[in-house]
From Swiss-Prot:
GO terms for biological process: translation. Part of the 30S ribosomal subunit. This is Small ribosomal subunit protein uS7. One of its GO terms (molecular function) is rRNA binding. The keyword rRNA-binding applies. HAMAP family: Ribosomal_uS7_A. One of the primary rRNA binding proteins, it binds directly to 16S rRNA where it nucleates assembly of the head domain of the 30S subunit. Is located at the subunit interface close to the decoding center. It comes from the Archaea. Gene3D superfamilies: Ribosomal protein S7 domain. InterPro entries: Ribosomal_uS7, Ribosomal_uS7_arc, Ribosomal_uS7_CS, Ribosomal_uS7_dom, Ribosomal_uS7_dom_sf, Ribosomal_uS7_euk/arc. The lineage of its organism: Archaea, Thermoproteota, Thermoprotei, Desulfurococcales, Desulfurococcaceae.
Amino acid sequence: MSEMQTREMLIGEIKLFNKWSYDFIEVRDPSLKKYICLKPVYLPHSGGRHEHKRFGKALVPIVERLINNVMRPGRNMGKKHLAYNIVKKSFELIYLKTGENPLQVLVRAIENAAPREETTRIMYGGITYHVSVDIAPLRRIDLALRHLTEGARLKAFHNPISIEEALAEEIALAASNDPKSYAVQKKEEIERIALSSR
């Protein structure tokens, strides 16, 4: 038995929040497979080490990217521990609702909420045209995560429902491709606008 194998046996399996395994998480969308990082980590906190590398975001664990999106608006900026606890509690709620590994549910939600095409403005002869373009995989993931957290935030704002429950519900709805999900609605809206400007 090699030294590496004995070390792995002593440490045990690395699990997210010490509960959910990274094994057998399937990414069905081939374009997103390379960019959804499911590398096992004890704590999803890289400290921005990816910042100065090109496409470094692709190496950041997907749960950390979700946590970073949860602490998005001004009053929550910098409160990563608060965002960490929100995601942790929402993952527990997802597990209670679905009975599945919350990581798998999150990956499915990202696949369903990631738009495939959008519009961009092109100036031609002094006139601005909106033209439909394909979206890069990293941007697809960024938009999906942004819409998931935005939907949870809107659902919890001025409402008795907590942000943890709202995030869990939004991820679960997006994973089942439910049109009641804010992220799925935004995806369909973006794709509809892109289709009309082809």
